[in-house]
Amino acid sequence: NITACPGTDRCKLANIDSVHLAREIDKRYFRKDMPGKIRIAISACPNACTSESLNEIGITGLRTPIRKPGYCTGCGTCVQFCQEDALVVSEGSIVMDQDRCLDCGTCVRSCVYGLLESEPTAYRITFGGRRGRHPKVGMHLITVNSEEAALLVIDEIIDWIYRYARIGVPIVQQLGVSLNFEEFKANLPKKIPADSIVCQ
């Protein structure tokens, strides 16, 4: 079961082409016989329109802003657009609070002078979320900088579940039993290109 928001084709807030990524995942795993139900949800930005963190596998598109301290005019347009109060004007320049920033990219798009740039688009991948009566937010697994790397991570997750999960038991209930998340997370960077990892 794969769900995706409209993505870059139809949404001005999108950071990634979520529909294309969903189609690529579907091509690889449609009708694959798995030991349990696997829901994959993709949101092209942190607005989380697909509630991706409440799925077994969640993918969120990120855009981390980069300030150019000597060039900012201090007009404050980005401050007005930021919904997290992560930006303030101080002594004629913009100061960013990294702890409050969600990497949504809104400030980058709002800069009328094009002085706010961004890191390469990133894909934050979570695992172990659950919907229903007892919802659970998925745990951060890894953040990568390309669709190709995101697909490699999904390949590793699916293979891991296929090999070790028990049939008929919800995936979330197997974490720490059949599925050792911490061990999987620790070994994952060895299986994907090092230059594609943003953070783990």
Pin down the residues of each PLM region.
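Small-residue-enriched alpha-helical segments and adjacent helix-cap loops
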Residues: 1-77, 81, 100
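Short glycine/threonine-rich loop-to-helix capping motif typified by GTGT followed
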Residues: 8-18, 49-55, 103-106, 175-193
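Flexible, glycine/charged-enriched surface loops at secondary-structure junctions
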Residues: 34-38, 90, 163-176, 194-200
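A domain-level signal for the structural core that forms small-molecule/cofactor-binding pockets
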Residues: 57-62, 120, 125-131
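Iron-sulfur cluster-binding cysteine motifs and their immediate structural context
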Residues: 77-96, 106-123
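A hydrophobic, small-residue-rich beta->alpha segment in the mid-to-C-terminal subdomain
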Residues: 129-166
